[in-house]
């Protein structure tokens, strides 16, 4: 039968991509249906119980700046918060939160159920309704037909999913959930290029069987960070420690002894796994010179004894898993509550997508998340938000929008995927962005919230908070420029103590803040209003003032790179001598010998960051010249 109501947007899948896609479309006023095989698993954290990290928190903050749910849910569920790279520059600082699985899932479900214009329905999707070369709806497992203007597929690991534990395997979308076989078969009949990827998860451990006294405690940060621009520490539940232990040579012997029954090393698994989140058997094999690897013991939540041992993801047989866990210090008597496993699934070449994440072959059909070859909750959420937003724009017959590489990490993610494709699960890093000083996690709202408001994704309360912050930054910056400290005054003497050098002329507070020795905290000793400035305003001002020169140069670089795209590359250029290029990129450039920067940028695997390095190298050797027409 046909469902009595038609929709503007149908989202298939209720994971991190699907929930953000459905919420984005509904926020924009589109009648949206979220179709999930199980309402109880909406927003489920299928793998590690954490949000954020290097490169990933930048995506979370951008999703938040555009009105998404992930950061707010993390603030409601986060049981430990840390800022990674806190001693490094602001471009690479990243917030990471350990999350209570149950609280996170509950927060997402509450947000979904209270979102206007959003309908949730429990049924697996088996087929797509087609009208010519466009999708026009979805057919469920029981034959129910839902009609819509657009469809967003966020199927995660469910398409043709196969779970492996040792040499045993069975069909599954994840442990305890059935795979999507009929839909996978239907998509394979379409002209998309399909491949197989794999990911894995470690065995879960009962905390009551672990000796934490021999492990290193890893507390959260004080003061406690927040993830959302609308969040606060008051939202956080009780905070807890994580712990660190290590594998040892005995562990590695056990793993090597089980390799003959590893589905990865016996050819049973054909899919490629994530390079930057390898299984423990992969680590032991690839890094045979190391006699130990860190294992982070992470609590799964406040109301459970289960632990997530981050660092020993495995698909080895269960008897080997048992031995390797028991060989690790502090886990000699550990009880495994769930075995580790690998899952292999279909993905589709993201080069078959537009920047909007609409497919090139089927109109009004959008892909987001692991179906595009990415790995990670944060990467999925970012794609989901973009796909849901563009599906709504398509339904409203409006022009699609996607951020440029210099506007957002979301732009970097999408551009990387559709330009270069991927042969392994794609993970975001700050190193993938050539404009990372502009794309900090702390300024995601200043970069994107105004655009989000224009697109209809920002509610009045978030807009009010954003405008107040932006105005406060402008006011305080102007005030710092207007307050001067004259030499030979009491404030000048105080400033000299802080700077460890005399002031020989007058300085504004703004000028003093530019000095590397002067921090916001020190500046507050010279001016009471500085001390009273809210943290989020002070943070922006300190970064903007101290890094103004670098930021201006990066802005100029963006403009220059556009102008210099057709610059000629010398035929005798020695790519092996260019510092910063990976060996893979050096090899490709040497083989192809591109004539111009533009041609170099189109070589698969040559990143925009590498093109920027080429441009810098050419300037240094003074060999920049335009290719004649």
Swiss-Prot record:
InterPro entries: FAD/NAD-bd_sf, GIDA_C_N, MnmG, MnmG-rel, MnmG-rel_CS, MnmG_C, MnmG_C_subdom, MnmG_C_subdom_sf. Keywords: Cytoplasm, FAD, Flavoprotein, NAD, tRNA processing. PROSITE patterns: GIDA_1, GIDA_2. Gene3D superfamilies: FAD/NAD(P)-binding domain, GidA associated domain, C-terminal subdomain, tRNA uridine 5-carboxymethylaminomethyl modification enzyme MnmG/GidA. NAD-binding protein involved in the addition of a carboxymethylaminomethyl (cmnm) group at the wobble position (U34) of certain tRNAs, forming tRNA-cmnm(5)s(2)U34. Belongs to the MnmG family. This is tRNA uridine 5-carboxymethylaminomethyl modification enzyme MnmG. It comes from Hahella chejuensis (strain KCTC 2396).
């Amino acid at each position: 039968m046909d469902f009595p109501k038609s929709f503007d947007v149908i989202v298939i899948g209720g994971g991190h991509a699907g929930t953000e896609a459905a919420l984005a479309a509904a926020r924009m006023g589109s009648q949206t249906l979220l179709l999930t095989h199980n309402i109880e698993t909406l927003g489920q954290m299928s793998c590690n119980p954490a949000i954020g990290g290097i490169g990933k928190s930048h995506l979370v903050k951008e999703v938040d700046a555009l009105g998404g749910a992930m950061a707010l849910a993390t603030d409601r569920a986060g049981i430990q918060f840390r800022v990674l790279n806190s001693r490094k520059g602001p471009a690479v600082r990243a917030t990471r939160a350990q999350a209570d699985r149950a609280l996170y899932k509950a927060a997402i479900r509450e947000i979904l159920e209270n979102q206007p214009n959003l309908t949730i329905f429990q049924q697996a999707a088996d087929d797509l309704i087609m009208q010519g070369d466009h999708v026009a709806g979805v057919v469920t497992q029981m034959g129910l037909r839902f009609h819509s203007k657009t469809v967003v597929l966020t199927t995660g690991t469910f398409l043709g999913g196969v779970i492996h534990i040792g040499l045993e395997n069975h069909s599954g979308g994840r442990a305890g959930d059935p795979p999507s076989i009929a839909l996978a078969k239907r998509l394979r009949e379409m002209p998309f290029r399909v491949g197989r990827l794999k990911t894995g998860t470690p065995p879960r451990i009962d905390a009551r069987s672990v000796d934490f006294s021999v492990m290193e405690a890893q507390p959260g940060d004080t003061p406690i960070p927040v993830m959302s621009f609308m969040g606060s520490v008051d939202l956080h539940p009780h905070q807890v420690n994580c712990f660190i232990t290590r594998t040892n040579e005995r562990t590695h012997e056990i793993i090597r002894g089980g390799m003959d029954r590893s589905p990865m090393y016996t050819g049973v698994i054909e899919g490629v796994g994530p390079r930057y989140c390898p299984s423990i058997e992969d680590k032991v094999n690839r890094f045979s010179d190391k006699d130990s690897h860190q294992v982070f013991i992470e609590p799964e939540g406040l109301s459970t004894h289960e632990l997530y041992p981050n660092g020993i993801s495995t698909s080895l047989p269960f008897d080997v898993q048992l031995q390797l866990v028991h060989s690790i210090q502090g886990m000699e008597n550990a009880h495994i509550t769930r075995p580790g496993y690998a899952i292999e699934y279909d993905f589709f070449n993201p080069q078959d997508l537009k920047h909007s994440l609409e497919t090139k072959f089927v109109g009004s059909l959008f892909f987001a998340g692991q179906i595009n070859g990415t790995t990670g909750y944060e990467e999925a959420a970012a794609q989901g938000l973009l796909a849901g937003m563009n599906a709504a724009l398509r339904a409203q017959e409006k022009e699609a929008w996607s951020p440029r590489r210099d506007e957002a990490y979301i732009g970097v993610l999408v551009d990387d995927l559709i330009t270069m494709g991927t042969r392994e699960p794609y993970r975001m890093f700050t190193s993938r962005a050539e404009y990372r000083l502009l794309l900090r996690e702390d300024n995601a709202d200043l970069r994107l919230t105004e655009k989000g408001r224009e697109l209809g994704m920002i509610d009045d309360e978030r807009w009010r908070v954003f405008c107040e912050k932006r105005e406060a930054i402008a006011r305080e910056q102007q005030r710092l420029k207007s307050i001067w400290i004259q030499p030979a005054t009491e404030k000048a003497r105080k400033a000299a103590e802080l700077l460890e050098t005399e002031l020989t002329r007058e300085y504004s507070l703004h000028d003093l803040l530019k000095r590397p020795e002067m921090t916001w905290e020190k500046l507050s000793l010279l001016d009471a209003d500085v001390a009273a400035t809210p943290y989020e305003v002070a943070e922006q001002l300190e970064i903007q003032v101290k890094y103004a020169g670098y930021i201006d140069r990066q802005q100029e670089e963006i403009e220059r790179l556009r102008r210099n795209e057709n610059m000629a590359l010398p035929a005798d250029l020695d790519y092996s001598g260019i510092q910063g290029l990976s060996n893979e990129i050096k090899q490709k450039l040497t083989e192809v010998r591109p004539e111009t920067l533009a041609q170099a940028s189109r070589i698969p695997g040559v990143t925009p960051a590498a093109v920027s390095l080429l441009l810098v190298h050419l300037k240094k050797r003074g060999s920049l010249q335009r290719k004649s027409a």
